[in-house]
């Protein structure tokens, strides 16, 4: 097999892996429904480019119809190349809107020199995007956070906030007006890096964020990458844990009625079993066999009809 052919096979495997990971997340959390109008938030980074690209692929083949509109917030950062995103979006034929709001000056004016800008910048950006989604009549807002972002958020909350809280794949906004989805929830960052190289996306660096050393999120990210390198499978196991929460073995009295425990009561996950098998669900394993009686992923709630986004469009009459 030639080197070129081998690389093509690897590229095809990568594209298929990403498409199925996104499709699985959409299916598991019922992220996309018939006739949705989805606002895809495009920053110019690798993650949001990949999100838009994969959603376009699914839009072309899915058994339901949904709209996509790309939205970029031009925050008026010095040196921001304003022409890059419009040129790219016009070249691929995606409807888009560029929203111009000078949040850069606001952040610089409000915060003291040397303070990290991410928190305030994020809040300002979120409010503007919610407003834009309402103006466009969008039913969903799609963000480009991936699996590693979700885990990093969990550790940020644990280490610095005293909360066991991550980043949900799907949520309702604080004002209750918007459904926010994260279709890349099952996708590894290292796969997104490879995909961006493969697709040659015109990446726009975030100078405002990149100029800030020792950010807490950056430190956590370095920790996760180090673990992934030194302990293969650890990241997969940690993400699996987010889908296998056992409230009776934590210490939150609002999640579990410890005060009401009685003798003879049977707990769903065992009363005194503190450490379970090291096996992980098949989705995150290396493909080896597992005992399904020991590992269960996200027990089914009340039955809901969910469209399989990875299925094909129905054939039209005469086709």
Curated annotation (Swiss-Prot):
Chief subcellular location: cytoplasm
CDD domains: TtcA-like (cd24138)
Cofactor needs: Mg(2+); [4Fe-4S] cluster
GO cellular component: cytoplasm
GO biological process assignments: tRNA thio-modification
Cofactor remark from the record: Binds 1 [4Fe-4S] cluster per subunit. The cluster is chelated by three Cys residues, the fourth Fe has a free coordination site that may bind a sulfur atom transferred from the persulfide of IscS.
Binding site for [4Fe-4S] cluster: 118, 121, 209
GO MF annotations, alphabetized: 4 iron, 4 sulfur cluster binding; ATP binding; magnesium ion binding; sulfurtransferase activity; tRNA binding
UniProt signal peptide: none
Enzyme class name: transferase
Catalytic activity line of the entry: cytidine(32) in tRNA + S-sulfanyl-L-cysteinyl-[cysteine desulfurase] + AH2 + ATP = 2-thiocytidine(32) in tRNA + L-cysteinyl-[cysteine desulfurase] + A + AMP + diphosphate + H(+)
Enzyme Commission (EC) number: 2.8.1.-
Assigned protein family: Belongs to the TtcA family.
Summary of subunit composition and partner proteins: Homodimer.
Role: Catalyzes the ATP-dependent 2-thiolation of cytidine in position 32 of tRNA, to form 2-thiocytidine (s(2)C32). The sulfur atoms are provided by the cysteine/cysteine desulfurase (IscS) system.
More info: The thiolation reaction likely consists of two steps: a first activation step by ATP to form an adenylated intermediate of the target base of tRNA, and a second nucleophilic substitution step of the sulfur (S) atom supplied by the hydrosulfide attached to the Fe-S cluster.
The protein's name: tRNA-cytidine(32) 2-sulfurtransferase
Gene coding for it: ttcA
């Amino acid at each position: 097999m030639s080197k070129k052919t081998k690389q093509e096979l690897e590229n095809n495997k990568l594209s298929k892996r990403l498409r199925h990971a996104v499709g699985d997340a959409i299916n598991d959390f019922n992220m996309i429904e018939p006739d949705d109008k989805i606002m895809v938030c495009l920053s110019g980074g690798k993650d949001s480019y990949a999100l838009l690209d994969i959603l376009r692929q699914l839009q072309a083949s899915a058994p339901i119809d949904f709209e996509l509109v790309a939205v970029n917030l031009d925050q008026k950062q010095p040196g921001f190349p304003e022409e890059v995103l419009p040129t790219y979006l016009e070249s691929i034929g995606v409807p888009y809107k560029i929203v111009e709001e000078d949040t850069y000056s606001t952040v610089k004016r409000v915060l003291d020199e040397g303070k990290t800008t991410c928190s305030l910048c994020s809040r300002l950006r979120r409010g503007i995007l919610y407003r834009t989604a309402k103006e466009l009549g969008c039913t969903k807002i799609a963000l480009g956070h991936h699996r590693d972002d979700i885990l990093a958020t969990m550790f940020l909350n644990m280490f610095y906030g005293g909360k066991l809280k991550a980043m949900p794949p799907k949520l309702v906004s604080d004002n209750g007006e918007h459904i926010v989805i994260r279709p890349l929830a099952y996708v590894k960052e290292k796969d997104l890096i490879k995909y961006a190289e493969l697709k040659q996306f015109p990446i726009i660096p975030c100078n405002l964020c990149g100029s800030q050393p020792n950010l807490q999120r950056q430190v956590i990210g370095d920790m996760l990458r180090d673990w992934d390198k030194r302990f293969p499978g650890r990241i997969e196991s940690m993400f699996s844990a987010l889908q296998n929460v056992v409230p009776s073995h934590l210490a939150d009295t609002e999640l579990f009625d410890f005060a009401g425990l009685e003798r003879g009561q049977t707990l769903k996950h065992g009363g005194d079993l503190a450490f379970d098998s090291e096996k992980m669900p098949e989705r995150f394993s290396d493909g080896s066999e597992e005992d399904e009686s020991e590992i269960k992923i996200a027990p089914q709630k009340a039955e809901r009809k969910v469209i399989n986004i990875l299925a094909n469009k129905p054939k039209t009459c005469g086709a």
